């Protein structure tokens, strides 16, 4: 059975930095990681620019659309950018990997879109999988994961401990 870690985080916790640092550290240590991590950069898209980085390649995909000053509370997710990132992740999942990481199970995934197919592909391949899950989407995540996940707090110690339990399985 595939091991799935759901990193549950609130609005005051930076899961993006946690997953990015974790993925980069593993990749530097020689672990084959197929994943997308979110890198929040400067101000070209309202307050922050949202980019997904394909782990290992450094390739980035802008997933933020500037909707103008009158859309402060609107969803700024760019479906075309997300689709391009999803395609790159799907291609990465076709290569040998020891771990898959998906930056977020958010609104798009809760509605059945976004990176749902790529999450499914990682599970189908039997890869250990880490997914960031905002607290506001835990109910949708629970319905999606069907109890097959380990819920983790948003901490490096929790991720390190979970990964240490997966290493023998990942090496097989």
Regions found by a protein language model. Give the residues of each.
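Glycine-rich P-loop/Walker A and Walker A-like loops and their local beta1-loop-alpha1 context
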Residues: 1-33
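Short, solvent-exposed loop/turn segments at secondary-structure junctions
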Residues: 14, 108-111
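Helix-adjacent hinge/juxtasegments
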Residues: 55-95
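Short Gly/Thr/Asp-enriched flexible loops that form oxyanion-binding sites at enzyme active sites
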Residues: 110-120
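Substrate-engagement module of ASCE P-loop NTPases
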Residues: 119-135
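Glycine-rich, charge-decorated loop segments at or immediately adjacent to ligand/cofactor-binding or catalytic sites
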Residues: 135-149
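A charged, well-structured terminal subsegment
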Residues: 153-172
